[in-house]
């Protein structure tokens, strides 16, 4: 199985933690969940100046400015799509939705076929990407 985490900082933490500190926190949270998903790690920090995507090891953001209001992350045990295309968090093309997911969708091929008939284009073979588009639909 994979591991997922979410962090919603208090108002004070938002003021005290810049993107550099949050990227370090994301790295620590990913490390704590490494036993749940040894194949890949990723996270997304939602700040007032946009979304910062992170990988492991966390890299410093281009801008250290911005207050983070939400941090989502995932450690991955690759089962269905073993390629890097299955890296999470997944983001919808319009940027409206972000998904971290732990589990397996057994009927994802049928769901994917239905969504493709409705014009959705997938970048991976991962069941998690199917879930993202199904929820956005």
Q: Where is each model-derived feature located?
A:
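N-terminus-centric sequence/structural signature that marks the extreme N-terminus
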Residues: 1-137
